[in-house]
Amino acid sequence: MNESIVISLGGSVISGDPIDADYLQSFAKILASSKFKRIGIVTGGGKTARSYISLLRSLGINENMLDEIGIYATRMNALSLASLLKGANPIIPSTVEEAVNLMSEYRFVVMGGTEPGHTTDTVAALLCERSDTDTLINITSVDGVYDLDPNKYKDARRFDTLGYREAITLSTGSSVGAGPNVFMDITALSIAMRSKIKVIVASRDLNNLKNILEGKPSVFTSIEEKA
């Protein structure tokens, strides 16, 4: 890892009623104590986004507008986190380019979604690529990438490492219908592959995240180029 890192913080991870404030506070403390000089964080929409989208879809709102509503939910989560981080950007950027520029000014740059059709994982991968950051930590609801949904199958096997193409194949197979086994979308993985960004897929466990940031033994799946 270099002096910068990007974290994709899944919306389901920070969901509460409507947001898990205790988790965000603890998450912020861990980041503040880390060795990294620049940290980009991209937040998902979580429960807030799902609630609005579900309600408005039932009223016949078109999918493009629903995407926009989801993006604003991610930015609200981003602003909530930024308010807890000393040295974070006070205004949430609406593009990756804006976020990259802010990374030269702030230690922590927090953002949400950018445009319809781009997941926050894709935004995080683009932020890595454009800021020359070589590692992306994807915090999800499970502790890595599995061959099967671990919440449904007791014999599901977690991978310690995967190549990019292996990960894309698994993501393609699990992307029909959202669920716990959809660890990262294909576009985000393709960006990681073309720029050789190491992706660490880990759970919301904060002690585990602290160990990852400190380079200590931890539980995750690493997605990177295989020899």
From Swiss-Prot:
ATP binds at G11, S12, G46, R50, T140, Y146, D149. UMP binds at G45, D67, T114, E115, P116, G117, H118, T119, T120. The keyword Chloroplast does not apply. It catalyses: UMP + ATP = UDP + ADP. This is Uridylate kinase. One of its GO terms (molecular function) is ATP binding. GO terms for biological process: 'de novo' CTP biosynthetic process; UDP biosynthetic process. It comes from the Archaea. Belongs to the UMP kinase family. Inhibited by UTP. One of its GO terms (cellular component) is cytoplasm. HAMAP family: PyrH_A. It is found in: Cytoplasm. Catalyzes the reversible phosphorylation of UMP to UDP. NCBIfam families: pyrH_arch (TIGR02076). Homohexamer. InterPro entries: AceGlu_kinase-like_sf (IPR036393), Asp/Glu/Uridylate_kinase (IPR001048), Uridylate_kinase (IPR011817), Uridylate_kinase_arch/spir (IPR011818). Signal peptide: none annotated. SUPFAM superfamilies: Carbamate kinase-like. Its main location: cytoplasm. Its EC number is 2.7.4.22. Pathway: Pyrimidine metabolism; CTP biosynthesis via de novo pathway; UDP from UMP (UMPK route): step 1/1. Keywords: ATP-binding, Cytoplasm, Kinase, Nucleotide-binding, Pyrimidine biosynthesis, Transferase.
